Amino acid sequence: MGILGLSKLIADLAPQAIRESEMKHFFGRKVAIDASMCLYQFLIAVRSEGAQLATVNGDPTSHLMGMFYRTIRLLDNGIKPVYVFDGKPPDLKSGELAKRAERREEAEKALKAATDAGDDAGIEKFNRRLVRVTKEHAKEAKELLTLMGVPYVDAPCEAEAQCAALVKAGKVYATATEDMDALTFGSTKLLRYLTYSEARKMPVKEFSYDKLLEGLAINNREFIDLCILLGCDYCESIKGIGPKRAIELINTYRDIETILDNLDSSKYTVPENWNYKVARELFIEPEVANADSIDLKWVEPDEEGLVKFLCGDRQFNEERVRNGAKKLMKSKQAQTQVRLDSFFKTLPSTPNATNAAKRKADEAKKSANNKKAKTSGGGRGRRPK
């Protein structure tokens, strides 16, 4: 699910935090990619020929096709990807997973009804909703990446959190995912649409963490509370509080505890046994592998291994696979070209920029308190600058 309404909120109130670029703009960059998100995209993709990609036994192979050619495209553009795979979900996510299971059951019923009615559009729609990434899909993708010479990381828990840890440690430039909670985990850069197909002609959308904090006039802790109010995977949100009201409340009261002390209980109902504090701690201290101990290496591809793995039962075209392997080799040889900024040492993310945002937020808080004192503490939040 990510964070509900966050991207639009940033676009509306902190547009300076978003930049659109072509893929080639990221030449020479190392990027941590949410592997499960990619595999899902590949599995639901419909080939222009309309045929289902599958082995001789009928097992889908579209995830491998997507991973193979999309990774080659990234490398062709000078980007060095590292794929990060999900581990076990945190206990707090059980509620969200239960909701997904319910939606899946509803989709199965709707698919049956569409099939009985001969509704082709409905069949396609509900088939897509039933797609999920399995352990077998992930296992095959890892084997493929190894043969391609591309590194991957097994996260102990959430992939987005591990990606953010790699960014903060200076191991990679950005996190590439469609889930905005990578920012909540503290990734200083987030790239959306990086792994979309070239045919969709979507520019890569880059979000800057420091600029969004500055634009929203909040610090990192307040941003986490904002994301919880908007709606995240780890706890319920307060019904009736949308993005606009959420940022007003955070700008006025600065944390959820103070918001709850001042919230109109006749207007808003707080969820029973609301686990917002545990969710907050999960964002602040997620379960991740130590990024400093992770060694990322891009090595030469195994052409014969790729042919053996992808052709035969998986029915990939051998000539295309060999051509792909040659492109991988060519990109490996071209990696001697570097970005100008790579001549300077890349340091892990520091709190300096967020401290500046915090100072600005504290000033805003002081101003808000003065305003409340003058007006005897009105309940409405000020509109953020």
Swiss-Prot record:
Molecular function terms from GO: 5'-3' exonuclease activity; 5'-flap endonuclease activity; DNA binding; magnesium ion binding; manganese ion binding; RNA-DNA hybrid ribonuclease activity
Primary subcellular site in the record, as a coarse category: nucleus
Region annotated N-domain, chain positions: 1-104
Region (Disordered): 346-385
Residues involved in DNA binding: 47, 70, 158, 231, 233
Keyword list, A-Z: DNA damage, DNA repair, DNA replication, Endonuclease, Exonuclease, Hydrolase, Magnesium, Metal-binding, Mitochondrion, Nuclease, Nucleus, Phosphoprotein
Taxonomic lineage of the native organism: Eukaryota, Metazoa, Ecdysozoa, Arthropoda, Hexapoda
Listed name of the protein: Flap endonuclease 1
Cellular component aspect of the GO annotation: mitochondrion; nucleolus; nucleoplasm
EC number: 3.1.-.-
Protein family according to the UniProt entry: Belongs to the XPG/RAD2 endonuclease family. FEN1 subfamily.
Region (I-domain): 122-253
Post-translational events: Phosphorylated. Phosphorylation upon DNA damage induces relocalization to the nuclear plasma.
Functional note: Structure-specific nuclease with 5'-flap endonuclease and 5'-3' exonuclease activities involved in DNA replication and repair. During DNA replication, cleaves the 5'-overhanging flap structure that is generated by displacement synthesis when DNA polymerase encounters the 5'-end of a downstream Okazaki fragment. It enters the flap from the 5'-end and then tracks to cleave the flap base, leaving a nick for ligation. Also involved in the long patch base excision repair (LP-BER) pathway, by cleaving within the apurinic/apyrimidinic (AP) site-terminated flap.
Swiss-Prot/TrEMBL GO biological process terms: base-excision repair; DNA replication, removal of RNA primer
Cofactor: Mg(2+)
Location in the cell: Nucleus, Nucleolus; Nucleus, Nucleoplasm; Mitochondrion
Coiled-coil regions, chain positions: none
Compositionally biased residues, Basic residues: 368-385
Listed CDD domains: PIN_FEN1 (cd09867)
Matching InterPro entries: 5-3_exonuclease_C_sf (IPR036279), Flap_endonuc (IPR023426), HhH2 (IPR008918), PIN-like_dom_sf (IPR029060), XPG-I_dom (IPR006086), XPG/Rad2 (IPR006084), XPG_CS (IPR019974), XPG_DNA_repair_N (IPR006085)
Ranges where the record places region Interaction with PCNA: 336-344
UniProt binding sites for Mg(2+) 2: 179, 181, 233
Top EC group: hydrolase
